Amino acid sequence: MRIRKNGAEMLARAGRSSLLASVAAAALSIAPAAQAVVPNDNLSPEDIVDGTDVNGVGIMYRDDGFVCTGTLINPRTVIFAAHCVNDLSTPDYSTVNGGVPVAFAFQSDARPGLIDWISNGYRTNTALSVYNVNNIAYHPDSLDPPALSFLYGDVAMATLDTPAADVPTWTMLFSALPAPAAINETTGTGYHVTVTGYGRTGSGTTGNSVGIDFRRKTAENFLGMLGSLDDIDS
């Protein structure tokens, strides 16, 4: 029998851990662990807390104290980074048989919902926009040693046990992006994006310095590169 800590203790442990952040940019962009939402020095991490409560970008919480950001693409499917879950095999994620329970919460401040999920036996609570996961699949290429778990094939999907009927979904873009308005040293590729997620943050001076507080942050930037690993000199 596994003995579970209470919700507050579990969240405190997660906040102290070295947690990974993935972000949604435009429809979705999955980021490596080193990425964080870092505003310039005119704004603080408090200033960039997302003012929209439920917008389809949610936080994934594993009962073993690991969190990531994911994006709802239909009422029962969330897309997120494989490195958030590929340390275990997919059958190991379960609310029964001693598995690791997983849920997604979609409120801007996800702490109350996650505490409720842990304290009440890992149950979906639609009133708090918290949905239990009943199936996970991740790309096998994310396990390739040269990939370091995220350099390529870093994509996973989770199925929710209850449709998130009242949560907005995001459309995935598979066609080419339209040409940007301008490309220069300031705009990089010229593609202006909105970046949002629950990961670490900081300021322009301190960089990635503030831990996860279970609140969704939002910022704007320009993409510095839009390409593949083959475009980067090793």
Task: State the predicted function of each range.
Residues 37, 47, 63-66, 174, ...:
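Helix-boundary and membrane-interface capping/anchor signal
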Residues 38-52, 95-182, 208-212, 227-230:
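Conserved catalytic-core segment of clan PA serine endopeptidases
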Residues 58, 70, 76, 80, ...:
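Terminal peptide-recognition signature
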Residues 65-67, 78-79, 84-86, 163-166, ...:
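Solvent-exposed loop/turn segments at secondary-structure junctions
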Residues 178-212:
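Short glycine/Trp-rich loop-beta-loop segment that forms part of the substrate-binding cleft
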Residues 217-234:
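Extracellular trypsin-like serine protease catalytic domains
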